[in-house]
Amino acid sequence: MKKSLKIMGFSLLSATAILAVGCKKKSTTDLSSTYTTAESSTEKEIKTTAAPTAPAQNPSAVVDPAFKTQSSTYQSDNKNVSIAYPKLAEMQDTAMQEKINALIEKNATSIVSALGVDPTKDKLDIQSSINNSDNSRLSIVYKGTLTKADGSTQAIFYTNTIDLKNGQDLGLKDFADAETMAKYLLSDDIQLSNASADVTNKFLEKRKSKSVEDYTNMLKNADFPVKSSDGKTFPSSFSYQNGGDIYFTVPVDHDMGDYVTVIYSPKTK
């Protein structure tokens, strides 16, 4: 492997590693973007609410003096697989920094094995953004597209929240109750993020095919770490927090975009 990292300091906004043979890393994109556009929906009315767009960040600015970030990319030799992910730098606890960076890379690239991506035939392009960070936790969002050899595509979305104090994965179960989220998912109050009226209406109907117990079990197993020893059982749902709100994904049919993102706002419940 070849590794070339470019240190990039940037403002961390409030708001995941499969090692294939012959892969390399190189510097890549700024990770300061964030997904904050929300769409409120009911069966009778579709209402869109766009969150304010964050101003452009100064690449040299560092809000949190506890650490800086680096942008790194995992690539196959033929560049058919490209996964961008952040790395931490200049932490006072260098052992913890190494542990966290290894965890970030492992989780970020685990999508390759989980989806059975063949770099000689398939193409996978994943970009990342830091969605929430402070001295205690780091939340990373990964978004991209998998194009199979037969031309079919799949929208990819996953997240990784890490406890910076102990270098462990955090999941939905660490900041929300799975059953409460499942009941909300099936309620009339549900809100979806960035979903069209057509997708929203289809999801509101299709969700009824599953029970509270079904969704509770899915959400109890949301997020990293990967639950199987072979690393091939990827979580069905991923979550993160942004501005006090809880976001989590639900898998749907390909014609609906492969996933929808549900927004739960504790302050309004």
Regions flagged by a language model, labelled:
Residues 4-5, 24-269:
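Compositionally biased intrinsically disordered regions enriched in Thr/Gly
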